[in-house]
Amino acid sequence: MAATEDERLAGSGEGERLDFLRDRHVRFFQRCLQVLPERYSSLETSRLTIAFFALSGLDMLDSLDVVNKDDIIEWIYSLQVLPTEDRSNLNRCGFRGSSYLGIPFNPSKAPGTAHPYDSGHIAMTYTGLSCLVILGDDLSRVNKEACLAGLRALQLEDGSFCAVPEGSENDMRFVYCASCICYMLNNWSGMDMKKAITYIRRSMSYDNGLAQGAGLESHGGSTFCGIASLCLMGKLEEVFSEKELNRIKRWCIMRQQNGYHGRPNKPVDTCYSFWVGATLKLLKIFQYTNFEKNRNYILSTQDRLVGGFAKWPDSHPDALHAYFGICGLSLMEESGICKVHPALNVSTRTSERLLDLHQSWKTKDSKQCSENVHIST
């Protein structure tokens, strides 16, 4: 019989100091990069996302040395949907989630192979780029022009984004993915920013949280996606007034019971310790939450045998909740965990490496411009 909410709350470990079993979580993420259990088979087309949870989790635990970085980088580049020689598929470029289509292995920047069903997926492009930066790659083999062209093709007239060019649901999740892609590539030509901002603004609900779209229910995940997107754009305080931001802060801070839930009257769930916690961090009021209750709830979902975190106590751990549980603990500066960048959802070490990359691109572009001017004169 499933545990009631009261039983879950009672089992949250409040009042006792629970240990964070770092080494077991390292081994859990290692296994996620190898052979996955049968129950993960339906996620084969999203394997790159599972790799992101594992790699970023290891990065947060300062344990990337346990993986073969070069092999994984080659695998990720083999998932890049590259332009064909005639560039007829430019609006389909990005990263796919795995090799399920049987496209020839091609980790280079050579022209892609035409396939009628091959296209990038917006979430896979986001996680693929994130993984490359996490692993220390310089993104030199990323066809940035093609990724941005593929991204532009996914934006709808209302400012939201689809996941794939054939069409799919369109909501705040993919606005966030698009914002991360543009931020990582240091090029916002991949979207009509004004339309995206309008979409985020119209998604504010009557109770002051953000929904997946206009007229829908406020949700902790979509509130994070909207607020984080605006922070990456550098537009948060331009879009919402101080009064509106205070209302959003109140909605978010009311999501804490012991851990956090995503909507009123819903059970708490490990992943919202990041989704809502990171939003509060971006809004600069995370320090007013109850760290002890949140920590105890997260650790009550820790699998003490195999590592990882579940959404609820006494449930099976999975890659998503394992990663976001660690990120939630990072927001509270748990010992043994690196700091997380609350908007980009990677370690601050990785975000700083990305800024160094941006600076090197800028220096390279300036040098090329100077050389071109010198040649023309």
Curated annotation (Swiss-Prot):
**Which of UniProt's keywords are assigned here?**
Magnesium, Metal-binding, Prenyltransferase, Repeat, Transferase, Zinc
Which is an annotated Pfam family here? Prenyltrans
Please list the residues that bind geranylgeranyl diphosphate. Answer: 219-221, 263-266, 272-275
Q: What is its EC number?
A: 2.5.1.59
* Cofactor(s) needed: Zn(2+); Mg(2+)
UniProt cross-references to Gene3D superfamilies, sorted A to Z? 1.50.10.20
Q: Which InterPro entries match?
A: GGTase_I_beta, PGGT1B-like, Prenyltrans, Terpenoid_cyclase/PrenylTrfase
Give the CC-aspect GO terms. CAAX-protein geranylgeranyltransferase complex
Q: Which residues bind Zn(2+) per the record?
A: 269, 271, 321
Main function: Catalyzes the transfer of a geranyl-geranyl moiety from geranyl-geranyl pyrophosphate to a cysteine at the fourth position from the C-terminus of proteins having the C-terminal sequence Cys-aliphatic-aliphatic-X. Known substrates include RAC1, RAC2, RAP1A and RAP1B.
The UniProt entry's sequence similarity note says: Belongs to the protein prenyltransferase subunit beta family.
What is annotated about its quaternary structure and interactions?
Heterodimer of FNTA and PGGT1B. PGGT1B mediates interaction with substrate peptides.
What is the designated name of this protein? Geranylgeranyl transferase type-1 subunit beta
What is the species listed in this Swiss-Prot or TrEMBL entry? Homo sapiens
